[in-house]
Amino acid sequence: MSRAGNRGNTQARWLGIGLLGLFLLPMYLSLEVSVGKATTIYAINGSAILLPCTFSSCYGFENLYFRWSYNNSETSRILIDGIVKNDKSDPKVRVKDDDRITLEGSTKEKMNNISILLSDLEFSDTGRYTCFVRNPKEKDLNNSATIFLQVVDKLEEVDNTVTLIILAVVGGVIGLLVCILLLKKLITFILKKTREKKKECLVSSSGNDNTENGLPGSKAEEKPPTKV
């Protein structure tokens, strides 16, 4: 009885975990926010940089709220926030903290883009930028993504020497393998032709020997007709 009871409790526990997972899974898959693959981007002092952000929702959205915030070790503030009424409306800004910020997003063609352009960069702009989205249609479900901006005096040139060496080595190895395969095919072809010639020579030599020895099947076997 105790084993049966334990088995029943285990099954009930796993069933409960499975049901909880099915309940929570749509929440994790519905509203997504992305700032691209790069976690850190670099920009030159005095230039402009586009901070990308897109969102997606499996259930659609209405009066979706979004905001960009900035923080570093010393300060934290909201840069811009706004509302996207629906998928046929462009994002509308409610509050903007800095005139250097421009909303570059659009929801047309299902892009769901709420990226911002930050102009006239300063070294103090270095920090973490977070794109936050909340969807009332999904019971105020929210999500966010963060990207780090590093403002530099100049962009460092990437040394591609190692990459070029690796590519050269790989290319050389591939070229060598191709040459080996071609050489192998050539040798195989030559050997095949050599065997065929040897075989022809042996057959021809055998025929000549038969003729000279008067063996059956040779011309020496033929006898002149008997005169009557």
UniProtKB/Swiss-Prot annotation:
Domain of life: Eukaryota
Cysteine disulfide links: 53-131
Region (Disordered): 199-228
InterPro entries documented for this protein: Ig-like_dom (IPR007110), Ig-like_dom_sf (IPR036179), Ig-like_fold (IPR013783), Ig_sub (IPR003599), Ig_V-set (IPR013106), Myelin_P0-rel (IPR000920)
Residue intervals of the Ig-like C2-type domain: 31-148
Gene3D superfamilies to which the protein is assigned, alphabetical: Immunoglobulins
Basic and acidic residues bias locations: 219-228
Protein topology in the membrane: Single-pass type I membrane protein
Compartments (UniProt record): Cell membrane
One GO biological process term: sodium ion transport
Signal peptide: 1-30
Transmembrane segments: 162-182
Primary site of residence: membrane
Cellular component aspect of the GO annotation: intercalated disc; plasma membrane; voltage-gated sodium channel complex
Tissues with expression: Expressed at a high level in dorsal root ganglia, at a lower level in brain, spinal cord, skeletal muscle and heart.
Keyword terms, alphabetized: Cell membrane, Disulfide bond, Glycoprotein, Immunoglobulin domain, Ion transport, Membrane, Signal, Sodium, Sodium transport, Transmembrane, Transmembrane helix, Transport
Glycosylated residues, chain numbering: 45, 71, 113, 142
Ranges facing Extracellular side: 31-161
Post-translation changes: Contains an interchain disulfide bond with SCN2A.
Complex formation: A voltage-gated sodium (Nav) channel consists of an ion-conducting pore-forming alpha subunit functional on its own that is regulated by one or more beta subunits. The beta subunit SCN4B is disulfide-linked to the pore-forming alpha subunit. Interacts with SCN1A; regulatory subunit of SCN1A/Nav1.1. Interacts with SCN2A; regulatory subunit of SCN2A/Nav1.2.
Described purpose of this protein according to its UniProt entry: Regulatory subunit of multiple voltage-gated sodium (Nav) channels directly mediating the depolarization of excitable membranes. Navs, also called VGSCs (voltage-gated sodium channels) or VDSCs (voltage-dependent sodium channels), operate by switching between closed and open conformations depending on the voltage difference across the membrane. In the open conformation they allow Na(+) ions to selectively pass through the pore, along their electrochemical gradient.
Descriptive protein name: Sodium channel regulatory subunit beta-4
Protein's gene: Scn4b
